[in-house]
Each structure stands twice: as structure tokens, then as C-alpha cells.
Amino acid sequence: MKRRFLLLQGPCSPFFDKLGQALKSTGRHVAKVNFNAGDSLYWNTCTAWKYRNHVDHLAEWYRILFEREDYTDIILFGDHRPVHRPAIAHAKALNIRVHVTMERDGVNAHSKLPKDPAWYRHIGPRIPDYSNGDPFSSPFRLRAWHDVAYHVAGMRNRFSYPGYQTHAPVMAHVEYRAYFRRAFTISKNKKRDLAAIQHIIYSRIPFWLIPLQLNSDSQIRNHSPFNNMRDMLELTLSSFARMSRPDSILVIKNHPLDTGLENYPRMLEDICQKVGLETHRIVYLESGPLPALLNHARGVVTVNSTVGGSALVHGRPLKALGAAIYDMPGLTYQGNLDSFWRHGKQPDRRLFRWFRNTVIHTTQINGGLYSGESIDMSVTAALPRLLTNKSLLETLA
């Protein structure tokens, strides 16, 4: 059967448009569903279905569309978005391939990657060693430009897509204002943060690192036991106050893309008072070199951040509090958080090398989503992955 691809919502960039063009150039049928004016702005390839109704009616709309058009594959970005969940359910019922970004069936906690270290020890020696890939330029200003263009176009939604409701918990214009304020805060505190890091490292103060994640991230909202980062910090600081060495400290580093809507210094003061932790045992950073912190940290506590992978690269003891693809015996601490401060162990280096190579080999491509150069790299690498009948992970089974 000739492959027929349906693209749903992608990132706020030309990536899906370029990918659609590439798929079409191979002779495959390509179409897309646009849910808002931003989607329409970034799609110029070919057929586009415009869904203008409320999301409550979307499941039936997908059912009719899938039966009529006989699609073999759907491609989407973000498997928890309300506009995607009914599509995934229908696709799986009809044995339609689901590509979430570049991974079959799901990402993060929905990934098909095994959690059994024995599987990686068996498969690992058969997988080639991967480097960090070819570098590319992708300035943050390009990502910001695409995001703003997407949401400015969205000002037409009330007329063009009256039923659309964003999946984001905070409106874009609110985030933009807060981010400008935070950019000023980062600039003002950069020297202070660097001096604090240097003092901790050169004084050999034992410290544990907590990399913050975004409250809006589906990794927190859908793949963790927490409603937000405050919940995670209350649990972690309470445990640290009770169970850690009294001469150790916590270094808490904010996410580089945090909008600044949360006042973390004030929040941390409140939590310290609540759990009985002295505030001098907390160092909060808005900026600073993460590799330097990872090189010297006694361990890392995260929900399920990609920084967890970096911690494993640096051989740091790691505790994951949420669902993470790297959370398995031999890589992360499997005991409870209270015992981690005293008994956390370094990851198995060989197991991590096999795990990393397998993840790259089966689920990753070299490229990006925002600059022209990085998009071209992504499309070139993605095309053969999308056109195979079996995923690379399935071929290893």
C-alpha cells in the first residue's frame, strides 16, 4: 500500500512544512490538519484540513477523516495535546503508524524503549558508538521570532478558528512580558551567580544539584506525581533538611527558558521556613555553567529533566522523581529520596554508554527545529526513519 501521511500540530517553526515537502517529493501523499492561524501560517506545502470546531467534537471528526482518507501514518509534536489525544487513539485502533516527533508511538513516559538494564546489556554491544553529532547554529532569537510570529497570527483565531483552545496553561502575551523581566534579572545576576558557583567549587563545599523544570512542561504535568515545581521542591527540601549531612548544601538552578512567572527566591524562603531548613543551605541560581556544577556535585535530584542525562554523562549519582526513560537500575538510584542523600551511587558507565547509544540509534536525529540549517539537517535525517515499515527499535527486538 502506498504510504499516506497526515501531519497534525508541529512546533512553532517551518519544520513540519519542510518535512511535508520532503515526504511529498518521494511520491507519498501528504496532508495536514491546521487547528489555528499559527498552524496555517507555517504550512504552505499542499492539502490542509482546517478544524474550526471545539475539541469535544474532534474524535468523531478524526474517525470520519481517517476512514475516508485511508492514512497510513500520522506525525505530531506533543502526544498530550488535546488535539492529538483522540487522533492517537483512533490511529492505534486502525493500526495507523503514529510518529511522535521522530519516535514511534510515543515519547518520554510513553516511549517504547525498555526499562530493563539486562536488555541494554544484551543489545548494547550490537549498537555503534555515537558521538555528539554534527554541530549547527540555532540562535535563540530565531526560536523567539517563530514563537512570536505563530502567536501574532493566532490573533485571527476568533474569526478563522473560533473553536480553538490552546493547550498552554499560560497565554503567550503573559509569558512574553514575564520573560522580558526575567531576561533583565539574568543579566543583573550573571556575575553574582558565577561567583557563587566558583566559591562553592573552590571551597569544596559538598552540594547537591536540583535543575528546575518548566511548570508548563508536559513532563511535569503528565509524567510526574507533581502539579508543579513547588510540589517537587517541598518534598525535596523537606527530605534534605531531615536526612542530609549538615555541612552540605542544595544548589537549585532555574531552567534557561523559564518565563519568570514564579518568584523562586521567595518560594524557597517560604519552603525553608515550612520544612525547617536553614536558608544558608540553599543557593539559588538564575544562570551559570551547568557542566561545572555537574562535574562537582555529590548528586542530582530531578523530576525527569534532560539534565538527568547530562548527570549520567558526568557520572553523578542521580535520583529521578518522575517517569524518565533513563530511570532504571544501574543508572539511577532506586531507593527512596530520604536514603539517596547518604547512599546514592554513581551510575554504571558501561550500561549508560549502551543505553545512550541505543537511544540515539533508535529515537534521535541530528538536527533542530528552528534555524534553516538545523531544519534541513532534521528533515534529511528524518525522511528514511519515517519511510521504513518497521522502526529501528522494532528491528532490535
PLM features: what roles do these ranges have?
Residues 4, 72-73, 207, 249, ...:
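Structural motif
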Residues 18-28, 239-243:
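A short, Lys/Arg-enriched amphipathic alpha-helix followed by its capping loop at the start of a domain
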